[in-house]
Every structure is written in structure tokens, then in C-alpha cells.
Amino acid sequence: MKILIFLFLLLLSSCVFEHDAFIPKYPNSVLPDGDPIPAASRSYMEGVYKITSGGKQFGDRAVLKWHGKDFSMFSETQGCYFVMKAVHLDSVIFMEGYWRYSSNNTTGLASLRISKANGSRNILSGKDGKIVIQGTYGIADGLPDAELVLEYERPFSDKVKQSDFYIMAHRSGGRNSDNLPASENSIEMIRYTRNFGTTGIEIDVRLTKDGVPIIYHDDDLNVRTTTKSPLIGPVKNFTWLELSSYVRLIHGEKIPTLEQALTFLVDSTELRAVWLDMKGDVNAMKIVIPIQQKALARARAKAHPLEIWVGLPTEDVIDDFLSYPGHEKVTSLCELAPEDVRKVNASVWSPRWTLGTQVDLVKQMHAEGRKVFCWTIDDQQFMKKFIDEGEFDGLLSNYSAMTAFYFYTQE
């Protein structure tokens, strides 16, 4: 028996789990030779575009949306997104980056431009006008050689411009199974998630053996979430020092503490919402809520508009929340029935997506001054239906780029 156990452990330790997060790199980039697109000019590029060449790969339409000095594009096919950088050189706008499908690993390079005749002069001088984006795209690490042309169709609708809709990313951006370039629930993923059009994130909160709140989804340390380490077993069996010293997430990052994650988010992102998914540790509220309040105070001091909701997914977590002195003043999100939402006076009700659009109940929550989010919706047809026909204030998804496309293309 001892020999069998040894052989099993040897086999387990030799297993290698591949996490294919290939990102193609553009050789001989023109970007270092150009100047950044002026902040005042960027909004003139934003809007809905018609794809007149390349539609077989990406669909009929695309959305262009800036985030800081970079921008993303979103199209309907497989929740495709483009991660792009842009400069202007001699009044021509050059754009380089890569595209990828949300629902699988298909990816490739993209090289685009807006010539003087096709709108770059108007954009750079802050004027409306015709815009045609021309260029090429590739597959995998091949150089771009297939034509891609996008023609500006319209700006975002008034409905979109006036909306306070939240594009919420699951596990700070996506799951490890989605083969993204950063691990789920990592600082690096919080940095990367803006490429999906994300405006808010959900993160999972657990306590270590010595009571430090960390961001980690599973009960135990395993090959799905971490690289091989000498630590095996439930997360709660280890101190923060032990986890920090010996455990790395699948892309080499350290497991962040809740305080580290929120501090980074406040200081280094434009995200405006955080959903703390409490995983049910006993007496966690007395530790987590002060960290939530500290992060909110930091955001206010930096004039960073931010909401942080303590998630209440079970009755036990609700009981812990209600036992916290002054819980009435703590912003929370409840996943249970409307009566539970009212009992805890939650700021947000968040039912699972399989319950449907529930328009009447959503309107009741709105009448009571609450927001309503739906989780975790990844099916494209239902996502479109929920945005077009529902009254939700936000959707939580592993594929936020899909959410962004359907939201920004609303008429």
C-alpha cells in the first residue's frame, strides 16, 4: 500500500497542466515613432463601426471604446475583443495590437490605420466626420495579411450615454479555464480586465489561518488555481506568510490580500465597482468590513468614484453580517430572495441568471432605491436578451467583452 501511495504522489507531482495564454507580439512596431493620441481626440473615434471587410472572422459590427491611453474593440463573433495601442505620425493614426475570441483561444495580430483622407485629421483636430479604419489581421503568430476594414456608423446612442450600466467581470476578469494572460483573482488580472470593457469586478474573499482576508476562489490549494508547491490542503490551514512564501498562482503571481487588491484598484485603475464574494468563513465580517471601509475612504480621498459591496450569498453569511455593529451603514449585495435583500437593506440585489429577467421584481427593487445585477451569464443569446429586454443595472460574466458589445450597440 505504501508503494502505491508513493507512486500516486509521484505521478501527481509530475503532472504538468498547460495554461495556454499565448499573446502574439508585433515585430517592427511603428508605435515608438509616433505621438500619443490626444485625450481630447479619443472620443471622436469611439462608437459603433460597420465591418465592411473581415466580417467572416469578426461579424458585421464592432464597438470602439477607449480606456486611458489605449482602446479596445468588441465584436459579436465569439465575444471577440481587440487589445490595441495607437499613435499619430504625420497626421496618420496607426494602431497595433491583437484580437482574441472570449470563448476560445483563437487569436492573432492586428495592424490598422486611419489615413488623412479617412478621418485622422478630423479626429486629431477634434472634429466629427467620416472615419474609415483600414488594415490587416493575422491568425496565431502569423503576420497580419487578411484585410480588415471598419467604417464609422454612429456614435453611442443617448440610451448608452445616459446609462449607469455596470459591466462586471467574474473573478476579477475571467476564470483560469479561459486561458487568459493573468490568473483569476490576481492583481495582474485586475490590471488587465479593462481590456474587456469592464467597469467593475467580482472577487472571492477567504480568510487564512491567521485571519488575513485573501482573494482566492477555491476551498483548497490545487492545480486549477496554483502551480506546484509544498503546501497541500484547505486554504484556511495556512497562514498568510506561508501562502505568500510558498504558493504562486498559475501565471506566477502571489495570492493577493484583500487590502492589496483594493489598494491597487483604487490607486491604479478606473474601475468603479467591486463585489466582494464572501466564501463563508466564520466571523469574517469583523475583519473584512473595516478593510472595505478603509478602501472606500482611500477612494474618496483620491476622488475615485467607487462602490464596494459586501456579498451575501448564504443565510450563514447574512447572519454574520447582521451581527456586525453598524451593519446598517455598510453597503452590501444580496444574492438571495427579495425579502432577504430588504432584511439586510442591501444596496444591490443579485439573482442568478437562470431565474430570467424578472422585470417586475427588478422594478420593485428600483422603486426601493436598489440596484439589480444578474450573475453569472455567459451565453450570448441570453446576454443580448437580458440587455435588450431586462431592466438590470449590470451583468456579471466571465466574458465581459460580450457584455460590452451588446451594451454599447444598443440603439
Predicted region positions:
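Sec-dependent signal peptide recognition
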Residues: 1-9
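C-terminal motif of bacterial Sec signal peptides marking the signal peptidase cleavage site
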Residues: 11-14
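Phosphate-group recognition and catalysis centered on beta-loop-alpha active-site segments
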Residues: 16-411
